[in-house]
């Protein structure tokens, strides 16, 4: 029995590490928009870590999808490639949270709001984690070119997206609400001091 439990844990850890290695390779030339131009892979790891720590998510499919959530949207990775390497369940979740980059940005943002309410519970979890991490980054390490107005608009848009994810995970939803309130306060404070 113990060997079976250890084997499952090792397999789960191996799957997560394999996903991190895959994401690190796919995002290797990408950087975040912050002033430090931090490695993009830090973002996807932060999303998965947040889901596990705050949301107490243990479903490996969700955590692997969180790590891979931007690979199809932001790299040359295909949904079929994800399915081949990580299974169709992971590929489906990633597909649900992937924007169609062929569409104009404003249309993509509107579609995120519309699609959130109909997303699977797993996709809603990934979306919650992604938006929490992004709101924290926009608050504390914004892209240098973003104005106060643009930062506040991002927070308001994120709230509209997450409205469709409500009822999925109370701890993550609470954290989202907290980071938005703190973010708005900090951004407005910084604007007043400028």
Spans of model-derived segments:
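Active-site helical microenvironments for divalent-metal-assisted chemistry
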Residues: 1-194
């Amino acid at each position: 029995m113990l060997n079976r439990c250890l084997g499952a844990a090792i397999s789960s850890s191996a799957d997560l590490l394999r996903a991190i290695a895959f994401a690190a390779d796919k995002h290797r030339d990408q950087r975040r928009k912050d002033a430090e131009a931090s490695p993009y892979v830090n973002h996807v790891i932060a999303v998965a870590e947040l889901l596990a720590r705050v949301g107490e998510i243990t479903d490996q499919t969700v955590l692997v999808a969180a790590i891979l959530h931007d690979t199809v949207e932001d790299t040359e990775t295909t949904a079929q490639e994800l399915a081949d390497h990580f299974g169709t369940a992971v590929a489906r979740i990633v597909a649900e949270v992937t924007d169609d980059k062929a569409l104009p940005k404003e249309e993509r943002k509107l579609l995120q709001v519309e699609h959130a309410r109909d997303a699977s519970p797993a996709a809603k979890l990934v979306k919650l984690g992604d938006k929490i991490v992004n709101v924290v980054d926009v608050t504390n390490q914004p892209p240098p070119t973003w104005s106060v107005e643009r930062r506040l608009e991002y927070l308001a848009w994120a709230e509209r997206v997450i409205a469709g994810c409500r009822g999925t995970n109370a701890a993550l939803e609470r954290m989202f609400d907290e980071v938005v309130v703190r973010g708005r306060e900090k951004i407005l404070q910084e604007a007043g001091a400028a």
